[in-house]
């Protein structure tokens, strides 16, 4: 990433995985109480920011299917601008890498990277806690990316505690299907009463290689998604025949963990023709973590 007074380029917006995802309740407002562990990956979209002197926020690259005014990146920049009253503007370029509707947090991560990068580019120096409070207004996953560490998450995903995770390589396979999160959350067959676990429960097993990630918990959304989307079910079955695998978020991506890049790439090489798979290393910290204190 280059850093100057006029631009910040090559800012990674990393993907996340849900190593497990339990739904423990439903609130009167319709939101669900969750428990999960979020894992950052060294793989994601890349954003570039160039200072404007006219105060305008502009997305200068087209993102198919996402109008500029509703793009979380633009909304994040305008939210930060309104909150601080800065006279600065910005041109934002987005190199999309992560598939949308995949459970990888792509849009949320883009928004968080925007908040962090503009905190530096606009010389705002807002503390991390203040950025996280703003991030909640953009979506439940955005505060995690501002938090910037692998985390045990509770509530609707905004209650975060740092967890230390071992370095692993992941193969992430994404079927060619978009899974609407709201559709899965509203399904009457979705489990909403999973027993609560503790961070101690998770940490007691997370260093074990036996059956990981199946050695702890599950993704409560996976059964509903695979019953509705045959493509996701097919990927889960294929990957599980290679090594224990699990869906992330509300899908559609499915992941498996490996001890080495070589093992992950060997599995990737066996993917059926036409399947989209990416190999990525785990991260312990967001690449822009230092942009907030």
From Swiss-Prot:
HAMAP family: IspE (MF_00061)
UniProt keywords, alphabetically: ATP-binding, Isoprene biosynthesis, Kinase, Nucleotide-binding, Transferase
Keyword Electron transport: no
Enzyme Commission designation: 2.7.1.148
UniProt protein name: 4-diphosphocytidyl-2-C-methyl-D-erythritol kinase
A single GO BP: terpenoid biosynthetic process
GO molecular function: 4-(cytidine 5'-diphospho)-2-C-methyl-D-erythritol kinase activity; ATP binding
Binding site for ATP: 99-109
InterPro entries registered for this protein in UniProt: GHMP_kinase_C_dom (IPR013750), GHMP_kinase_C_sf (IPR036554), GHMP_kinase_N_dom (IPR006204), IspE (IPR004424), Ribosomal_Su5_D2-typ_SF (IPR020568), Ribsml_uS5_D2-typ_fold_subgr (IPR014721)
């Amino acid at each position: 990433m280059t850093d100057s007074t006029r631009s910040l380029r090559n800012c990674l917006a990393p993907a996340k995985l849900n190593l497990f995802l339990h739904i423990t309740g439903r609130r009167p407002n319709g939101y669900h109480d969750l428990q999960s562990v979020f894992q950052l990956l060294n793989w994601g979209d890349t954003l570039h920011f160039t200072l404007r002197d006219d105060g305008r926020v502009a997305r200068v690259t087209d993102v198919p299917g996402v109008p500029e005014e509703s793009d979380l990146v633009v909304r994040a920049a305008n939210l930060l601008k309104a909150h601080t009253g800065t006279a600065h503007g910005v041109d934002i370029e987005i190199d999309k890498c992560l598939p949308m509707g995949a459970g990888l947090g792509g849009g949320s991560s883009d928004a968080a990277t925007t908040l962090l990068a503009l905190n530096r580019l606009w010389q705002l120096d807002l503390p991390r806690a203040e950025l996280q409070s703003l991030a909640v207004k953009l979506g439940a996953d955005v505060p995690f990316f501002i938090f910037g560490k692998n985390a045990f998450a509770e509530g609707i995903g905004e209650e975060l505690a740092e967890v230390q995770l071992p370095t692993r390589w992941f193969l992430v396979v994404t079927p060619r299907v978009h899974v609407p999160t709201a559709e899965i959350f509203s399904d009457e067959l979705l489990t909403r009463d999973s027993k609560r676990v503790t961070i101690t429960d998770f940490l007691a097993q997370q260093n074990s290689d036996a059956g990981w990630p199946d050695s702890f918990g599950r993704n409560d959304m996976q059964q509903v998604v695979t019953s509705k989307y045959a493509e996701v079910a097919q990927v889960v079955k294929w990957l599980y025949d290679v090594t224990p695998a699990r869906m992330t978020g509300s899908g559609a991506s499915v992941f498996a963990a490996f001890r080495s890049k070589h093992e992950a790439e060997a599995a990737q090489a066996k993917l059926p023709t036409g399947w989209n798979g990416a190999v990525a290393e785990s991260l312990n910290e967001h690449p822009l973590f230092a942009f907030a204190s």
